[in-house]
Design a protein with these regions (language model features):
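M16 family metallopeptidases and their MPP-like homologs
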Residues: 1-105, 120-127, 198, 205-294, ...
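Proteolytic maturation boundary segments
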Residues: 47-51, 55-58, 78-224, 357, ...
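Alpha-helical scaffold elements lining the catalytic groove of polysaccharide deacetylases
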Residues: 347-351, 355
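Flexible, low-complexity linker/tail segments at the boundary of structured domains
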Residues: 363-364
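Enzymes that process phosphate groups on RNA ends and nucleotide/triphosphate substrates
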Residues: 448
Length: 526
């Protein structure tokens, strides 16, 4: 890859560390580079890397009729600047299929010996400037580099398991009803455990199926005094992996497959999201089952998470954007107990066992979950797997909804302004408007039109005419729970000397849009 400039190609290694862990981080990445140079990669490591590369090429080939224009632009630019050939994905995929299986791991290991050298080395070290904080000196770093060849190292042991994702015998459910919707072209399935599934075939992409499962409840059902655990629920619950697999082991088990699943617990809902290649649909279903039923506890992974979080929070106050975000939250929600600002001193109060309990509570009843499967779907092929895995999800027929904790954006017109010392002075301005709006397809569509029209207006008036900013971000959002509400945010950054003039233009153009609506030219482009 290029290093700082296109005239300098380099093999580079990067690490982020705690403030007091710079020496350890540097030594660790140098040890791994030297280990790879001295002993090479293992056969199993290489097989996984090759399988993942082949899968990515296969996916690109399958999507060859749906390639985005931007991808072609990138290829043309690379061809013009670097003389990179453009044979097309059909030829590239055929070539990779022929060549990749015949490239041995020894060839890659020989390349590592050429890439990791004892000369022409550059080290960049960047960190916060703080009184009392010491970093390694140039001489200390140079001494560490000289020690590389004498590091006491052993070959890497790649622990690989052939264990299936699900080792237990799953007794699946049944599809108890099936109904086609001719208006939307979808099919509704109801399973024996109460799970509802909507399947909608689309041809936007040839090698993709998207999944979303939703249930009402979320973190709103937990008391306010658990806000520290609530704030870290999504980060901590699955930090140890799922089933019998740590996160690292799971990535090994999924080598060569294109399937991923994640869980998310918001204020009023708990969700399961996933995507896969059609050929890996069963793998996505298996991951969904494990994500629902089997969060894996790993105390070591949890401690690592806490250490990373502490390092992140240590210097967050020095970041002007952190201060800006905190100020916005305070301005919108005041002293509401759920509008917490997590501090480093709070991290040790995170209760891992309690978070696992909270997670399991949210996913112990699938009977009120509705799943949506969209993409290159084959309903008849998928139905047995839907019944087996989604039909096996736990069900206790719990009838619940979210709890309204009254965390509303305050009413009225307010202006908050604060200053923070910066090396390069810059003003960040946010306008936020909120109000009641019916949550339906029409409102969401109109809001999308408004976002796009405002983007065009502000690009013309503020970026091009005034030259005052690189861009203005307009983002409207409709929410249904806990109440139907519309929030419109308009954000931009500029020279502090220009902020008042540009802010006036933002308001002027927004009021004009409210009175006149988008122009015919804008609607044509939308």
């Amino acid at each position: 890859e290029y290093f700082l400039a296109k005239t300098k190609e380099a093999f580079s290694l990067t690490a982020n560390s705690k403030i007091d862990g710079v020496d350890l981080a540097m030594k660790t990445i140098l040890e791994e580079a030297e280990r790879a140079r001295r002993f090479g990669f293992t056969e199993t490591e290489y097989e996984r890397a090759r399988a993942n590369y082949m899968q990515a090429m296969e996916s690109a080939y399958n999507e060859r009729e749906k390639t985005k224009s931007g991808n072609y632009v990138d290829e043309y630019v690379n061809n013009f600047l670097d003389k990179e050939p453009i044979p097309g994905i059909e030829f590239e995929y055929m070539l990779v299929q022929q060549m990749a299986p015949n490239i041995p791991v020894t060839a890659v290991n020989e390349l590592m010996k050429q890439l990791v050298t004892d000369n022409n080395q550059v080290v960049l070290l960047a960190g916060p400037q703080k009184e009392g904080l010491k970093y390694p000196t140039k001489e200390e770093i140079a001494a560490l580099l000289k020690q590389m060849s004498s590091f006491d190292l052993k070959p890497y042991e790649d622990k690989v398991s052939n264990e299936p994702l699900i080792s237990e015998d799953i007794k699946g459910g049944k599809i108890v009803s099936e109904k086609a919707d001719d208006v939307y072209g979808s099919t509704k399935l109801v399973l024996s455990n109460g799970v509802t599934v909507y399947v909608k075939p689309t041809d936007f992409k040839a090698d993709q199926i998207m999944m979303k499962g939703v249930s009402l409840g979320g973190t709103s059902v937990f008391p306010n005094d658990e806000i520290i655990n609530i704030s870290q629920l999504n980060g901590v619950a699955l930090v140890g992996g799922i089933g019998n697999f740590s996160k690292v082991d799971l990535s090994k088990a999924l080598a060569g497959k294109r399937a991923s699943v994640g869980a998310g617990i918001g204020n009023t809902t708990e969700t399961i999201s996933g995507s896969c290649s059609p050929k890996d649909f069963e793998t996505m279903m298996q991951l969904t089952y494990l994500t629902f039923t089997s969060p894996r506890k790993d105390n070591e992974a949890f401690e690592s998470y806490k250490n990373r979080l502490k390092a992140q929070l240590q210097n967050s106050d020095a970041n002007p954007m952190t201060a800006f975000s905190d100020t916005v939250t305070r301005a919108l929600y005041g002293d509401h107990p759920r509008a917490i600002k997590l501090k480093e001193s709070m991290v040790d109060q995170i209760d891992y066992d309690r978070i696992l309990e909270m997670y399991k509570d949210r996913y112990k009843d699938a009977s009120d979950f509705t799943f949506y499967l969209v993409g290159n779907v084959n309903l008849e092929q998928m139905k047995p797997m839907i019944a087996k895995y989604l039909g096996a999800l736990p069900s206790i027929n719990r009838k619940e909804t979210f709890k309204d904790n009254k965390m509303y954006i305050r009413k009225g017109e307010y202006k908050n302004e604060f200053a923070k010392k910066q090396e390069t002075p810059m003003a960040t301005i946010m306008f936020l408007y909120s109000g009641t709006c019916k949550y339906d397809l029409r409102s969401n569509t109109l809001l999308s039109f408004l976002d796009q029209a405002l983007d065009m207006v502000y690009t013309a008036e503020i970026r091009e005419k005034e030259g005052g900013t690189y861009g203005v971000s307009c983002n409207g959002n409709l929410s249904k729970y806990p109440k139907e509400e519309l929030v419109l945010q308009i954000v931009f950054q500029t020279d502090p000397a220009k902020k008042d003039k540009l802010s006036a233009i933002v308001v002027e153009q927004l009021e004009k849009m409210a009175k006149e609506g988008p122009s015919a030219e804008h609607m044509q482009k939308i």
